[in-house]
Amino acid sequence: MRACILFASPRGKDSNTRALVDIFLRVWRAAGHEAEVFSLYDLAIAPCRACRGCQSDHTAPHCVIDDDMTPIFESVLQSDLIVFASPIYSWYCTAPLKAAMDRLVYALCKFYGDTRGPSLMEGKALCALTTCGYRVDRAADLFDEGLRRWCKHARLRWLGLHGARHMGYGTQFLTPEIEENAAEFAENILKSV
């Protein structure tokens, strides 16, 4: 199997969110699967223009914006699992991931043109990894609900959201409990894909 991971933390490889991604990757790759990680803060991803240029071709993304989304479109189309990984700062994902989500749902769901087409993501699985400063059920609940609806609309299978709370900058994030919970989530995703 193959996974496409959209990682969207401004703190990069030293972030708490990246720690969860690394645990997920360790479990995923140990099972013999491939993964491609895109660090969205290192890429140029423009917001969707809602121009509907992508709707003229029902077989490919065909986005008219020439930026770093092109390899992401291809990776998503080749993957069985899509993973969104973002810290939760204002009850939702960071801006680069939101821009990528908007571009994906327009370019890969051919629902918005003169004739209705398919979702090119139909049947793929999606899960999310998040970190936050509040309790996960109070910080990531809106993102969780948004992803449920996003999946229903785009005809993906929603496998769930895993979140971990960081108690503050002066405290250690990656505790044995957080690491164990993240690995367990990854194992469950393996069984569900």
Give the positions of each predicted feature.
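N-terminal beta1-alpha1-beta2 submodule of the flavodoxin-like/Rossmannoid cofactor-binding fold
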Residues: 1-86, 90-109, 113, 169-172, ...
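Short, glycine-/small-residue-rich phosphate/pyrophosphate-handling segment
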Residues: 112-159
